Each structure stands twice: as structure tokens, then as C-alpha cells.
């Protein structure tokens, strides 16, 4: 029987680090638990199986018509602008695919990020005396860098003493440099918040920089949090609402 609800295809980058795929699958399980009526599939761009083209071929063979392809990315940079559209263009013509927006920025992501900081030992009362490093993966895309800077400003407005962006690759400054910079301003403590979804090489680089520079608090990655799962479903709903009526009836 034809299901008018589009399949949600979560597209992750993939990694040689097994923690990455484990986190992605844990997140998609949480999404399924929040919206049991929606079919959720996972595909990877590289390193992990199944690859996105394999998932799309299987869906087409099963008679699926409509797919919302959701990049599991916090920022709109190269993968969202180039890699993923190129892969989706190779899909079978019978599939009607809409690429959803990336996850960030979104208020729920900041909620998840602050919750990770509190889980790491901070409390809301510490905000006014804590310098915060917003550590992201990094990008050569100016738009992506500007978004991270804007998120840092938004966090500053929620009460943190100071918030500075840092990047694990492709852009400067690095995490250790920003930890030392904040320390030099005389804040009581310095905390590092990885603005990344899953463990892997770049988050490990963030952790190494934080520890090398003597950060007082290092939060965990966002991971398969309830907030992240809710943002995924919000992006799915936005894309579904934008589809032609015949695809959403």
C-alpha cells in the first residue's frame, strides 16, 4: 500500500572511527522512537555502509516514491552544497527527492550544547564567570564560518562571560589558542563545547587542544540527544510541507 509520507533518509558523512556510525545509528533510532509513523533510513557518503546510492536504489526497487534527504550536518558548507546534491542527482528518475536544510543553526542545538556543558560539571550559575570556546569542525566556506561566529554571539547573549569560536581544521583559530586567549582575560574558568554531532578525528583534535591548553571543562559532543532528534524531525516536516500536494496527501 502506498504511504504518502516521504521516507526520511538521513545522510551522514561517514568515518573510519566506529564511534561515528554508532552515534548516527543511535540518533536515527531516537528519531524513529519520536515519530514511529515515519520510515527512517540512513546512508553514508563514504567509509561506512550503506552508501547513499545503495539506499536510494533499494527504496526505488521497493516502490517508494518520495524521499526527504536530510544532511546530518550542522552547517551549510561543501557537503551540503556540492557532495550531497551530486549524489542525489544520480538517483533513479522515479524517486522524487527533496534535500532538506542542514540542522543548524537552531535554538534546540544550543540547548543541547549547554546541557552537555552542565553534564560536564558546569551549572547555570557559572555562566557569568566562564569563558566558552565554541569548537566546531571547521570549513573553508565563508558562509559556514560566519554562521559559527553568529552562534557564538547568540551564546554570549545568554549570559556566558565570553564566547569565542574555534575550529579543528580548515580555519583558525584552533581550540588550544582560544583556551589560552580566554584564560589571559582573567575568567574564572574556561570551558570547551564541541559543536559537532559525533565522535571522530576532528572531535578528538578538539579534545586534545582543550587538554593541552588546560581547559577546566570539556563537554561531550552533541551525540544522539533528544534535542538533535527533534531538530531532524523539524527539518523533515519543513521539507515535507514544501513538497507538492500529491507528495504529501
List where the protein language model places each region.
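Active-site-proximal alpha-helix that buttresses catalytic centers in soluble enzyme cores
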Residues: 1-249
Amino acid at each position: 500500500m502506498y504511504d504518502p509520507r516521504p521516507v526520511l533518509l538521513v545522510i551522514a558523512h561517514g568515518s573510519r572511527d566506529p564511534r561515528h556510525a554508532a552515534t548516527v545509528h543511535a540518533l536515527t533510532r531516537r528519531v524513529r522512537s519520536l515519530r514511529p509513523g515515519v520510515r527512517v533510513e540512513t546512508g553514508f557518503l563514504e567509509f561506512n555502509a550503506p552508501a547513499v546510492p545503495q539506499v536510494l536504489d533499494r527504496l526505488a526497487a521497493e516502490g517508494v516514491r518520495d524521499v526527504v534527504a536530510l544532511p546530518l550536518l550542522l552547517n551549510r558548507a561543501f557537503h551540503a552544497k556540492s557532495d550531497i546534491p551530486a549524489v542525489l542527482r544520480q538517483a533513479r528518475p522515479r524517486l522524487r527527492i527533496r534535500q532538506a536544510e542542514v540542522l543548524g543553526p537552531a535554538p534546540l542545538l544550543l540547548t543541547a550544547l549547554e546541557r552537555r556543558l552542565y553534564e560536564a560539571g558546569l551549572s547555570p550559575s557559572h555562566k557569568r564567570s566562564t569563558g566558552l570556546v565554541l569548537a566546531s569542525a571547521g570549513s573553508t566556506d565563508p558562509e559556514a564560518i560566519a554562521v559559527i561566529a553568529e552562534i557564538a554571539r547568540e551564546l554570549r547573549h545568554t549570559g556566558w562571560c565570553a564566547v569565542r569560536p574555534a575550529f579543528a581544521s580548515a580555519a583558525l583559530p584552533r581550540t588550544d589558542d582560544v583556551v589560552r586567549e580566554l584564560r589571559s582575560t582573567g575568567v574564572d574558568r574556561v570551558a570547551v563545547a564541541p559543536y559537532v554531532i559525533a565522535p571522530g578525528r576532528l572531535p578528538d583534535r578538539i579534545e586534545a587542544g582543550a587538554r593541552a591548553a588546560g581547559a577546566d571543562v570539556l563537554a561531550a559532543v552533541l551525540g544522539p540527544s533528544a534535542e538533535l532528534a527533534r531538530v531532524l524531525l523539524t527539518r523533515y516536516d519543513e521539507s515535507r510541507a514544501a513538497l507538492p500536494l500529491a507528495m504529501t496527501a
